[in-house]
A protein has these predicted regions:
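Active-site metal-binding core of divalent-cation-utilizing nuclease and nuclease-like domains
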Residues: 3-43, 47, 158
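Conserved N-terminal glycine/acidic-rich loop preference
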Residues: 32-46, 88-104
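Catalytic cores of nucleic-acid endonucleases
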Residues: 56-100
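Non-catalytic C-terminal interaction segments of nucleic acid-processing enzymes
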Residues: 96-186
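Short acidic loop-to-helix transition motifs that present clustered carboxylates
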Residues: 33, 55-56
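Active-site ExK catalytic segment of metal-dependent nucleases
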Residues: 47-54
């Protein structure tokens, strides 16, 4: 039997939580002119997960890879077994591959290839996931001078200029972990 996206998601989340510990998932996240199936946040990275079930084709994958590479620190393609033979032809070498198969009543996962750091990621685009108040929280913590009346784009640029990348990675992850959807967004 073929695995569909809906069969893969929840078991995938459980697999990654067991494997990695503290993670947070955001589904169907807009990234430029594409949509990430899953954005996963760890303590110091934001990771893109593109699901290619047995029913999916590679038609949009080339364009999706371009956008994933702009936004995420690491990227994985999660594939049904029908894609195992040819997936490497369609993704960069630094992308990870997680294969999933049916095993009785469960979905089994295997990390076929670990993802390497994505050097094409644009910090400004990664920071665009943050709401204004999250950017302001980072600014209050890290920037000595007060900058008022900055647009979100100007605030992101100022933080990139003033705060080292490793610190920003951790602070972005913290803000995404702490995000509260019960309060109003900006």
């Amino acid at each position: 039997m073929s695995l569909l996206d809906k069969d893969i998601r929840e078991p995938l989340f459980m697999y990654l939580e067991i494997k990695l510990g503290k993670v947070r998932f955001f589904e169907e996240k807009e990234i430029g002119r594409a949509r990430a199936d899953v954005m996963m946040v760890t303590d110091d990275a934001v990771i893109g997960l593109e699901i290619k079930s047995d029913a999916d084709s590679y038609a949009r994958l080339k364009r999706q890879v371009r956008y994933y590479d702009k936004y995420f620190d690491y990227n994985y393609v999660v594939i049904g077994k029908s894609h195992l033979k040819h997936i490497e032809e369609h993704i960069p070498k630094y992308w990870g591959i997680i294969s999933c198969t049916e095993g009785g009543e469960d979905v089994q996962f295997e990390e076929v290839r670990e993802a390497s750091k994505n050097t094409k990621r644009d910090m400004n685009l990664k920071m665009s996931f943050l709401w204004r108040r999250e950017l302001e929280t980072i600014k209050r913590e890290c920037v000595k001078f007060k900058y008022y009346d900055l647009s979100k784009a100007q605030l992101r640029a100022k933080l990139i200029e003033k705060v080292d990348e490793q610190t920003l990675d951790k602070l972005i992850s913290r803000e995404l972990f702490d995000r509260d959807y019960t309060t109003l967004v900006d």
